[in-house]
Amino acid sequence: MSINVTEIVLHQIHQTEGETPELNTVLRDNLLAISPEVEQMMLQLHQAYQSKAKAYGIFKNESIFAQQLNRLLEQETDFLPFSHSCAKMLSSELAKYPFASGGTFILCRYNFLATDYLFIALIDSRTSMLVDDQLEIKRTEYLDITQYDIACRINLTELKINAQSNRYLTFIKGRVGRKIADFFMDFLSAEEGLNPQLQNQTLLQAVSDYCDQGELSAPQTREVKKQVFEYCKGQINSGEEIALSELSEALPTLNEVDFAQFTQEQEYGLEENIPPVRNALKTLTKYSGSGKGVTISFNADLLGERLIWDELNDTLTIKGLPANLRDQLARNK
């Protein structure tokens, strides 16, 4: 798949040394020329971003960033001065956080699969070694474009079509945790938008309720949940979202009501397209839990066969232990 870069610029944010380090910006005075190397770099950044855990946001009414972005989209300003303003705002906001260390600031407008995006990221540099033409070993630095967690992306196409959307802005949650989310919320003057975790949990509840109102037996319910899981797993593997209408077509109609109609009538508040969350969806086909030194996980279809639950006595009986567990028990008896 190809990527079409329309405008891109790099700036530097440096951290000064000393007892009270500060962040300084070094701004380019022209845009980067679009070359195969530039487009290959952006394709790798795009692919890496696609694979990362992301949160969704929307701009606040008073967002200065949103106002400047709107001026750019309305062609009231050019990309370069817009990027200068963004770099200064990012540096000013980043300086408030203890993880601030500077890096290469990338701001790029590109098109991928008929969708326009604005990509903003702060990329670290890494040190490595190279062998030159004289077979001497020298140090070199390179942009770490696969491992980064300070980045956001705005779906300009989505924003143009529906300014009331709750999913046009995404940003990486990051290994630093909530602080990264707070940082980008403040930098963009944004607030939480779509909540994928909540949407997935609501979807699972809707599936259970759908089976209940259809008066399905336990085996039939497990089969429906397995169908849901297989569909969602396929969407995850292909990098696609859960389409409620497609999922509904894959499930049986119960009491003359299909799944999509059921969710609308019961007002679950589900989006038509839901970003899948793998860990949440696992509960469709697995039971798992831990506590007091015990961790248990098993496939749902084994309940009532190899695993017998006695709710009254609060016990779970396992018929046929896993071979490796049995061997460990035998060695340590």
From Swiss-Prot:
The keyword Cytoplasm applies. GO terms for cellular component: bacterial nucleoid; cytoplasm. It is found in: Cytoplasm, Nucleoid. GO terms for molecular function: double-stranded DNA binding; single-stranded RNA binding. InterPro entries: Nucleoid_associated_NdpA (IPR007358). Keywords: Cytoplasm. The keyword Cytoplasm applies. Pfam families: NA37. It comes from the Bacteria. Its main location: cytoplasm. Belongs to the YejK family. This is Nucleoid-associated protein APJL_0454.
